[in-house]
């Protein structure tokens, strides 16, 4: 039977499948046509995300049904060197006790007029 897969760009892909095909098989066919790895694909039908081990028949997907293809977003880990740089930039500061202005680490007086250029400074608290 023939089904359609619609991408977020509006492109429609036509696939030749059987109702006994698994979602894994469908994703492999999409990879063959579009080059998108199966682990980045999410297929939606009738508002539900289709699970890899199930078949098209399990979801009552019939001929000429339309599935929606969404790409999975992946997060990443920040490298330790970038983490140290971010920590230095965000945490190595002095804070004015009167107006809460963030100041450079070697500050002696606040730079703001509203607290009278106070010399009551404290280091910024460290995040655990």
UniProtKB/Swiss-Prot annotation:
Superkingdom of origin organism: Eukaryota
InterPro entries with a match to the protein in the record: Ribosomal_eL40_dom (IPR001975), Ribosomal_eL40_sf (IPR038587), Ribosomal_zn-bd (IPR011332), Ubiquitin-like_dom (IPR000626), Ubiquitin-like_domsf (IPR029071), Ubiquitin_CS (IPR019954), Ubiquitin_dom (IPR019956), Ubiquitin_ubiquitin-like (IPR050158)
MF terms in GO: mRNA binding; structural constituent of ribosome
GO BP field: translation
Residues joined by cross-link Glycyl lysine isopeptide (Gly-Lys) (interchain with K-? in acceptor proteins): 76
Positions of crosslink type Glycyl lysine isopeptide (Lys-Gly) (interchain with G-Cter in ubiquitin): 48
Keywords, comma-separated and alphabetical: Cytoplasm, Isopeptide bond, Nucleus, Ribonucleoprotein, Ribosomal protein, Ubl conjugation
Gene3D superfamilies listed in its UniProt record: 4.10.1060.50, Phosphatidylinositol 3-kinase Catalytic Subunit, Chain A, domain 1 (3.10.20.90)
Domain Ubiquitin-like: 1-76
Alphabetized Pfam families for the sequence: Ribosomal_L40e, ubiquitin
Record's GO cellular component terms: cytoplasm; nucleus; ribonucleoprotein complex; ribosome
Keyword Nucleus set for record: yes
Family statement: In the N-terminal section; belongs to the ubiquitin family. In the C-terminal section; belongs to the eukaryotic ribosomal protein eL40 family.
Anything else known: Ubiquitin is generally synthesized as a polyubiquitin precursor with tandem head to tail repeats. Often, there are one to three additional amino acids after the last repeat, removed in the mature protein. Alternatively, ubiquitin extension protein is synthesized as a single copy of ubiquitin fused to a ribosomal protein (either eL40 or eS31) or to an ubiquitin-related protein (either RUB1 or RUB2). Following translation, extension protein is cleaved from ubiquitin.
PANTHER family cross-referenced by the UniProt entry: UBIQUITIN (PTHR10666)
Name of the protein in its database record: Ubiquitin-ribosomal protein eL40 fusion protein
Native species: Nicotiana sylvestris
């Amino acid at each position: 039977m023939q089904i359609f897969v619609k991408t977020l760009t509006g492109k429609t892909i036509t696939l030749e499948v059987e109702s006994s095909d698994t979602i894994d098989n469908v994703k492999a066919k999409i990879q063959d046509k579009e080059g998108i790895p199966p682990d980045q694909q999410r297929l939606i039908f009738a508002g539900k995300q289709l699970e890899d081990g199930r078949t098209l028949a399990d979801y009552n997907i019939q001929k000429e049904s339309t599935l929606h293809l969404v790409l999975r977003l992946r997060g990443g880990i920040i490298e330790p060197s970038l983490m140290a740089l971010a920590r230095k930039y965000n945490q190595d500061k002095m804070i004015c006790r009167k107006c809460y202005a963030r100041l450079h680490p070697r500050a002696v007086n606040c730079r703001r007029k509203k607290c009278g250029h106070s010399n009551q400074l404290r280091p910024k608290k460290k995040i655990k």
